[in-house]
C-alpha cells in the first residue's frame, strides 16, 4: 500500500526471551483502581468506581531511557502500574475467559502533568493534555504470560532518587485483571496490541528534571527512567 505522507512509526515493546517485538495498537488506562490512591486524590472508592481513559501509542518510552522533562507543566507526577498486553481480540469478553486474551505483562509509568489535569477538571474540560503527551509512558519489556502466569498478588513500588514513594500490592486492585479486561471489552472491541495500564497504588507525587525513577513489580520486572537535568 502506498501513502501520500510517510506512515506513522509503529510503536512496539521488547519481549523477554525473543528478538520479536510486541506491536502496540492502543494504550488504555484504568483510573483510581487502588482504593488508597482514590482516597489520596479526594475520591470515595465505594461511591466512585474505577474508569477508563487513553494515551497515544507513541507515548511509549523504552526501559532505561533518559528523556526530557515535558513541556507546559510545573507538576509532573509518577504513577507506577502493572500493564496488561492483549494478544487476542474480542468484544463482550466473559470474565472467566478474559485471561485467555492476555499475551503478557509489563511494568509501566503513567506520567501525568497534574497541574494541567487539575485545571481541566476544575473547568470541566477533557484532560488529555494532562495524560496524553510525548514520552508519558515509560515501559519495561513484556513478560509472556505462558512464562510467568497471571499475577494476582505481589509487591509493586516506585522510588525517586532511591527513596520509596509508592508502595502497594497487586491484590489491592479494585478491579482485578480479568474484571478490567471483561468490562473494557463491553465499551470497545479489544484487539491484539492493545495494552491496559491497570492503575497505581497510593503515593503519587512530583518529580523534577534530573530525577531518576525506579519501579518494580514482583514477577514482572524493573523499570528505570531518568529526566534529563535542565
Model features per residue range: what roles?
Residues 2-21, 33, 37-45, 114-230:
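Catalytic-pocket segment enriched in acidic/His residues
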Residues 52, 66, 83, 104-106, ...:
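Generic structural signal for residues positioned in beta-strands
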Residues 1-97, 101-102:
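Extended, compositionally biased flexible segments
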Residues 26, 49, 82, 107, ...:
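Structural beta-strand/beta-sheet cores of well-ordered domains, especially the beta-sheet scaffolds
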Residues 100-107, 116:
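Extended Lys/Arg-rich, glycine-bearing segments that form polyanion-binding/interaction patches
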Amino acid at each position: 500500500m502506498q501513502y501520500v505522507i510517510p506512515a506513522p512509526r509503529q510503536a512496539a515493546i521488547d519481549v523477554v526471551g525473543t528478538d520479536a517485538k510486541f506491536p502496540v495498537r492502543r494504550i488504555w488506562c484504568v483510573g483510581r483502581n487502588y482504593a488508597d490512591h482514590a482516597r489520596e486524590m479526594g475520591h470515595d472508592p465505594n461511591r466512585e468506581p474505577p474508569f477508563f481513559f487513553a494515551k497515544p501509542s507513541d507515548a511509549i518510552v523504552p526501559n532505561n531511557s533518559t528523556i526530557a522533562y515535558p513541556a507546559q507543566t510545573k507538576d509532573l507526577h509518577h504513577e507506577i502500574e502493572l500493564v496488561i498486553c492483549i494478544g487476542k481480540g474480542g468484544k463482550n469478553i466473559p470474565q472467566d475467559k478474559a485471561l485467555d486474551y492476555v499475551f503478557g505483562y509489563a511494568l509501566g509509568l503513567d506520567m501525568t502533568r497534574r497541574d494541567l489535569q487539575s485545571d481541566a477538571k476544575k473547568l470541566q474540560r477533557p484532560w488529555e493534555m494532562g495524560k496524553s503527551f510525548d514520552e508519558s509512558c515509560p515501559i519495561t519489556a513484556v513478560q509472556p504470560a505462558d512464562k510467568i502466569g497471571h499475577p494476582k498478588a505481589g509487591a509493586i513500588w516506585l522510588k525517586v532518587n532511591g527513596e520509596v514513594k509508592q508502595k502497594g500490592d497487586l491484590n489491592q486492585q479494585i478491579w482485578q485483571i480479568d474484571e478490567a479486561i471483561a468490562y473494557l471489552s463491553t465499551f470497545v472491541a479489544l484487539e491484539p496490541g492493545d495494552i491496559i495500564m491497570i492503575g497505581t497504588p497510593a503515593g503519587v507525587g512530583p518529580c523534577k528534571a534530573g530525577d531518576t525513577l525506579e519501579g518494580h513489580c514482583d514477577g514482572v520486572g524493573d523499570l528505570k527512567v531518568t529526566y534529563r537535568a535542565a
